[in-house]
Design a protein with these regions (language model features):
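Autoinhibitory propeptides
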Residues: 1-63, 70-86
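Subtilisin-like serine protease catalytic core
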Residues: 52-168
């Protein structure tokens, strides 16, 4: 209908995140067709452009918080280049057997130090038992804050930020 087409045209005129970006659409599509994660939406929104020169906006000195289904802290996409976790802490409100954060009487807090200890352990869940069975929180954190994957097929919007998690 005319209203649908009008709405579609209006959206196409809306400026993206960083002005009207130009990107090599063909290279993005080739990467997607090669089995890499489709980064077209990140390119179209301007995220890839602001990550590069001259802005270099990658989330450095920023902490992003996620209140969600938890996080799969063992994933490589949530680590820095040295393999350490970029998660500053997890407050798992579903686990009542650990120490709650200061000022609270429920849930269990897992610090960055505890998470890093778990990452080098043979039994990580014995140290930090927090999980994300649903996966939603992990996906959201990866999209917003994921580190670049080694083969270049993925990077999050703010790959240099720190991550704070509250699991409900």
């Amino acid at each position: 209908t005319e209203n649908y087409r009008m709405g579609q045209r209006a959206y196409s005129l809306t400026p993206k995140c960083y002005g009207l970006m130009e990107y090599d659409r063909e290279s993005v599509l080739r990467a997607a067709q090669a089995g890499n994660l489709n980064t077209l939406s990140m390119a179209e929104s301007g995220i890839l452009a602001v990550q590069g020169e001259p802005l270099n906006l990658t989330g450095k000195n920023v902490t992003i918080g996620f209140i969600d289904t938890g996080i799969r802290y063992q994933e490589d996409v949530l680590r820095d280049l040295a393999g350490r976790s970029r998660i500053v802490g997890i407050w798992d409100q579903t686990i009542q057997t650990g120490t709650p954060p200061e000022g609270f009487e429920y849930g269990s807090e897992y610090t960055n130090e505890m998470i890093n200890e778990a990452l080098v352990s043979d039994n990580p869940l014995g140290i930090v038992p927090s999980t994300d069975a649903n996966g939603h929180g992990s996906v959201m954190a990866s999209l917003a804050a994921g580190s670049p994957i080694e083969n270049g097929s993925f990077t999050g919007a703010a790959p240099d930020c720190q991550i704070a998690v509250v699991k409900l």
